[in-house]
Amino acid sequence: PLARCALSLEGAEMSSVKRQTTASSQQDGVSSQPVETHPFEPFLPEGCRLLMLGSFPPSEKRWSMRFYYPNFTNDMWRIFGLCFFNDKLRFVDATAKSFCLDPIKAFLTTCGIGLYDTATAVRRLKNTASDKDLEVVQPTDLQAMVRKLPQLT
């Protein structure tokens, strides 16, 4: 089901991260904002059965770790802790205001969960990670990624 979902994106407009046309990108056809390339490699553990896709990471100044969903105010890792371990602090280092990267990676690997994003290069139209403020310069080749994941369900 998920593989079919990912494959159905071929030729479709990405819904959450849209190619933005703005006044800044209309000046001589080039945006004044720099192009950012994705800072992380896809996290695709052996036996990956589920591929979770976000849009693009926040700017590095907002990171609490060098991995997906790095902003300490983002609840992704708290939700995973609560759902799978009944402990929203399972992956949280409250003292350092960070997430515990090694346990997160071990959990994802054990569960066969891969992570990446729908864009590999973007321009930030504003200083945010909000989908509406991202201009996708290069979308991720999801078909190529899915072909590398034969156990994807």
Task: Label each PLM-derived region with a short phrase.
Residues S15-S25:
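Polybasic, lysine-enriched low-complexity intrinsically disordered terminal tails
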Residues D28-T153:
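A polyanion-binding, active-site-adjacent surface
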